[in-house]
Amino acid sequence: MNPFPRAEISSSALQTNLAALRQQAPASRVMAVVKANGYGHGLLNVANCLVSADGFGLARLDEALELRAGGVTARLLLLEGFFRATDLPLLVGHDIDTVVHHSSQLEMLEQTVLSKPVTVWLKVDSGMHRLGFTPEQFSTVYDRLMACSNVAKPIHLMTHFACADEPDNTYTSVQMAAFNTLTAGLPGFRTLANSAGALYWPQSQGDWIRPGIALYGVSPVTGDCGANHGLVPAMELVSQLIAVRDHKANQPVGYGCFWTAKQDTRLGVVAIGYGDGYPRNAPEGTPVWVNGRRVPIVGRVSMDMLTVDLGQDAQDKVGDSALLWGKALPVEEVAEHIGTIAYELVTKLTPRVAVCLA
């Protein structure tokens, strides 16, 4: 077996997760969010596995064009919209929807000559204060879009939650109320719910939900696990032991002699490091799954390798598999040890890691 790390992507897990989310929001269509290379799972891999999704959400135009070139015919939505007037003919030519969240985009729509109108999702800033038009701006912007011949009718409406991943935080209710009041009586689709909205705020589900991380089997909520919602990890990040060595008590290991053994033990060296996207700041004790058990990282993660304490009586050998995260070792647990979020772990894998459908 190739000793280098690989991300094995389960098509059945992706399909299971889509079905679970449909069950959570039976009245809603699903806009599967596949930005950032399908959250590190491979853009076309994910889209081809999720052919039954009603649409796909993306961050960048090149992602949408890659899906169209790959034969994807479903609705595509640019969640950050377009950035240049020259993008607009590409949206028209490839039948790509766009979010409009800024006055510069509105002006480009008004000033560009297009062969047919573009489908627009007008983004309301209901309280996240990142992208979108404020309630005070909304009516004027909506009227201008309605008057613009380059905009298909009806105009669809959306917002994004700041704190939906905190189920006890009432700010999500405040945002929902603001959005619903502002858009009451208007035609078009409505979409509010991201993964956390779909799982924890059913009243936010609307016409479309926009799940991202949950599609990949991961909970959006710190301290929670996707399995609690019927989700299955879609990624198994796997490498192997490239060395197993006896190690004496009171001897250090790794750069900076950061860790010293308290007793005689056996160490395993795993072929993965920060050059592959595994975080350098993973602290001592971060778990790795080897031969049916958790073993702790010891010493510093280096560019190509990390070291684990296999234990004094370990029988592990060179070539044995090491799971960095996956079904047996949830990525949420690893992220909590490292002090980050699962989103960051799965999206930061570098091109050295082979991504393959398993």
From Swiss-Prot:
Gene Ontology CC terms, in alphabetical order: cytosol
Cofactor: pyridoxal 5'-phosphate
Keyword hit for Isomerase: yes
Binding positions (substrate): R130, M303
Pathway linked to the protein: Amino-acid biosynthesis; D-alanine biosynthesis; D-alanine from L-alanine: step 1/1
Entry keywords, A to Z: Isomerase, Pyridoxal phosphate
The keyword Transmembrane helix belongs to this UniProt entry's keyword annotation: no
InterPro entries referenced in this protein's UniProt entry, alphabetically: Ala_racemase, Ala_racemase/Decarboxylase_C, Ala_racemase_C, Ala_racemase_N, Ala_racemase_pyridoxalP-BS, PLP-binding_barrel
Superkingdom in the source lineage: Bacteria
UniProt modified residues of type N6-(pyridoxal phosphate)lysine: K35
Function: Catalyzes the interconversion of L-alanine and D-alanine. May also act on other amino acids.
Family membership noted in the UniProt record: Belongs to the alanine racemase family.
Name of the molecule in the record: Alanine racemase
Organism: Shewanella baltica (strain OS195)
Gene: alr
